[in-house]
């Protein structure tokens, strides 16, 4: 994975956390902002997608928590709250990811979740976030079906879907 995509993923994760502050009213009373990060840490997608995404996210979070990177409120972390990542492996399939997402929101009490690469996982977890009325930012789901088949108020995507990428590639190759 080239440097552009690693930086893009890290910026996505941090942007999601900032956006979550506006949506998560309860977070303002906390000392920490818990951010769930779901990406492949094992399996075939780990080396090219998941581990670089995790490393980039951890680097940016560490910089924000130290006050070494610009943050939205000119304070350490976000608005003075330290960012506490809760990192989960996406490997294991859609059924596992539905339970993992519920655990992140209900057991771990994360304020928001950023992640998901596998299209099947994205399709499975999006309705759960909507049901629980919790912010979910999908950063690399290739399927266009997520927003074609359903309407969400709490689920967002930061990257183009595979159809857009493929059309752009074909036009470029012409």
Regions found by a protein language model. Name each.
Residues 16-17, 27:
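Cleavable N-terminal signal peptides
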Residues 36-58, 88-94, 117-120:
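Extracytoplasmic "Venus flytrap"
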Residues 95, 110-174:
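Extracytoplasmic ligand/sensor domains, especially the bilobed periplasmic-binding protein
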Residues 77-80, 86-94, 160:
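Short beta->alpha junction loops
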Residues 54-85:
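Signal peptide-proximal N-terminal region
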């Amino acid at each position: 994975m080239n440097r552009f995509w690693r930086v893009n993923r890290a910026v996505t994760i941090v942007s999601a956390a900032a956006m979550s502050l506006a949506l998560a009213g309860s977070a303002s009373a906390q000392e920490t902002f818990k951010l769930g990060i779901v990406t492949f840490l094992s399996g075939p997608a780990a080396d090219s997608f998941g581990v670089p995404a995790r490393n980039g996210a951890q680097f940016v979070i560490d910089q924000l928590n130290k006050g070494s990177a610009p943050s939205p409120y000119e304070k350490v972390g976000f608005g003075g709250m330290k960012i506490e990542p809760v990192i989960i492996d996406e490997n294991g399939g859609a059924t596992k990811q539905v339970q993992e997402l519920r655990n992140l929101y209900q057991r771990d009490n994360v304020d928001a979740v950023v992640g998901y690469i596998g299209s099947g996982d994205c399709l499975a977890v999006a309705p759960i976030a909507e049901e629980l009325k919790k912010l979910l930012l999908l950063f690399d789901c290739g399927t266009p079906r997520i927003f074609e088949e359903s309407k969400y108020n709490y689920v967002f995507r930061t990257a183009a879907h595979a159809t857009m990428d493929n059309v752009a590639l074909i036009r470029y190759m012409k």
